Amino acid sequence: FNDEKGFGFITPESGPDLFVHFRAIQGNGFKSLKEGQKVTFIAVQGQKGMQADKVQAEA
């Protein structure tokens, strides 16, 4: 995830990587993801293909 650009990719357990935009990350404050961080999300059809939405960091 690139904090400066506000987007990155999620690698699901199966299937291709999914694009994720900072607006899709749930929560307050600065929205970012760390490499290797476990998350839950839903896959949705975006303008340029499948992408992650309603992304939440796992506790």
Swiss-Prot record:
One of its GO terms (molecular function) is DNA binding. It is found in: Cytoplasm. GO terms for cellular component: cytosol. Residues 1-55 form the CSD domain. Keywords: Activator, Cytoplasm, DNA-binding, Stress response, Transcription, Transcription regulation. It comes from the Bacteria. PANTHER family: COLD SHOCK DOMAIN CONTAINING PROTEINS. Affects cell viability at low temperatures. This is Temperature acclimation protein A.
